[in-house]
Each structure stands twice: as C-alpha cells, then as structure tokens.
C-alpha cells in the first residue's frame, strides 16, 4: 500500500523552498480547524491533526500562532471545504481538496488547470470510490517488525507497515491517527517525518515518460492554486 513518501516530501520541499505558499495553505487550514472547534488542540482533534502535519513541514510557530489567534479573535472570514474529482492524461485519476471563500472561482480555476494540461474535471464521485482514506505516519529509528510489535503491545491496529529507505511508514484507519502516534511516542519516538491523512488509490498506474511529464505539469498547476490544500492521484511517479 502507498506511495514513496520521502520522494513526495522532497519534491514538495524543493518546490516550496523559495516561497511562503505552503505556509499560507497551512495557515488557512489551521484557522479553519480552530474556528470550527476549540482553538486548543487538546480539545480539538482536527486541529491537533493539522498541527502534527504542520510539524513535518517545519511550519514556523509564528504562522501557527497567528492562525489560531485569528480564529480566537472572532474573524468573520469563512471557508468551505470542497472536493473536486477528475482525470489526467490516459485516464489517470485525481482528487483535489480545497478550502475556499469563493466556490465559483475555485471550481473554475481547478477546471482550467485540468483542461489546459490534458485532463478534465469529472462529477462528484467519479473517482473517489477508487481510493481509501487512511492515516499515514512515518518515522525513523525502528524496523517494520519493531513498529508492529509496538502497536500490538498498545492494542492499536494498522492496515499496513512498510520500510522506505530509513523510514518506517504505517498506514492505519483515520480514527487511529492519534492512537498510532501516541503508541510510538510512548516507545521513545519523538519526531515524525510523515503525519498525514491521505487518499490511497486501490491500484496505481504507470505512464510513459512523455505522458508522465504532462501529468506532473497538470498536478503542479492544480497544486499552485491558492485554494487547493491537497491533491491525490493514482499515478506511480517513481
């Protein structure tokens, strides 16, 4: 199960190295999570999960604090969660999650990013049934067998555990996100390189070099949109 998480994170880090784009996206997501519940992560599981993910991207504390204070301050700025589904070259499947304060603008922008790069936006439900939502936790310092033993001792279930380079990647049901992290923290793991909720495709597809280049250009165009928070797909980019 899964994708090359280290490769994905390295690509994102390289892409965002000279911009504040990723911080702006996290700022928005943190604000929305804090506004929808308590601004205290210990009392708000959604906010806690966003903050755990933000740590893996080294989001500055100032960005996090500003977003939470904005939510505390009673800002009337509101965002809606929207999911768009579509197809890339050769029928590759794509899911786009967005937070927007203008649904018409975002839908138009996402549709254009698909259309200008060899893809097309589909209707709701056209591809999501081919993906499963999972929690993904990654860390160094243990083997897959050791990770399994830790989870078994803590009575926490995992869907799959793999080793990728020097990193152990654990896939679990979404409602086990915090339980998995807590089990490993109790076993001495202090830092996580991956802490995500993801949509994992049932089956991945491989594209030819030229088609893959076009597909990656399309994904980049979608990810560059201000309102887009996450993009998932079923293409093996290894």
UniProtKB/Swiss-Prot annotation:
Note the superkingdom of the native organism: Bacteria
Which InterPro entries does UniProt cross-reference here? Answer: Integrase-like_N, TACO1_YebC-like_2nd/3rd_dom, TACO1_YebC_N, Transcrip_reg_TACO1-like, Transcrip_reg_TACO1-like_dom3, Transcrip_reg_TACO1_YeeN, YebC-like
Keywords, in A-Z order: Cytoplasm, DNA-binding, Transcription, Transcription regulation
Gene Ontology BP annotations: regulation of DNA-templated transcription
Entry's Gene Ontology cellular component terms: cytosol
Report the locations given in the UniProt record. Answer: Cytoplasm
Pfam families assigned to the protein according to its UniProt record, in alphabetical order: TACO1_YebC_N, Transcrip_reg
Q: Name one GO molecular function term.
A: DNA binding
Quote the PANTHER family the UniProt record gives. TRANSLATIONAL ACTIVATOR OF CYTOCHROME C OXIDASE 1
What is the similarity comment for this entry? Belongs to the TACO1 family. YeeN subfamily.
NCBIfam families (UniProt xref): PRK00110.1, PRK12378.1, YebC/PmpR family DNA-binding transcriptional regulator
Entry protein name? Probable transcriptional regulatory protein ABC1956
Give the species: Shouchella clausii (strain KSM-K16)
């Amino acid at each position: 199960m899964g994708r090359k998480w280290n490769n994905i994170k390295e690509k994102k880090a390289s892409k965002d190295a000279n911009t504040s784009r990723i911080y702006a996206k996290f700022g928005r997501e943190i604000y929305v999570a804090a506004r929808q519940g308590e601004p205290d992560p210990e009392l708000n599981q959604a906010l806690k999960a966003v903050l755990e993910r933000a740590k893996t991207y080294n989001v500055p504390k100032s960005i996090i604090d500003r977003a939470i204070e904005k939510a505390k301050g009673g800002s009337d700025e509101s965002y809606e969660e929207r999911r768009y589904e579509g197809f890339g070259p050769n029928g590759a499947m794509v899911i786009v999650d967005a937070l927007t304060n203008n649904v018409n603008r975002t839908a138009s922008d996402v549709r254009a990013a698909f259309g200008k790069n060899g893809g097309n936006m589909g209707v709701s439900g056209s591809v999501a049934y081919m993906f499963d939502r999972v929690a993904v936790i990654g860390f160094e310092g243990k083997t897959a067998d050791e990770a399994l033993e830790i989870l078994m001792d803590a009575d926490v279930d995992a869907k799959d555990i793999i080793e990728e380079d020097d990193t152990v990647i654990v896939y679990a049901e979404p409602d086990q996100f915090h339980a998995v992290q807590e089990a490993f923290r109790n076993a001495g793991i202090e830092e996580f390189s991956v802490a995500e909720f993801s949509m994992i495709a049932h089956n991945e597809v491989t594209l030819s070099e030229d088609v893959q280049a076009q597909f990656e250009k399309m994904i980049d165009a979608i990810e560059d949109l201000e309102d887009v928070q996450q993009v998932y797909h079923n293409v093996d980019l290894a």
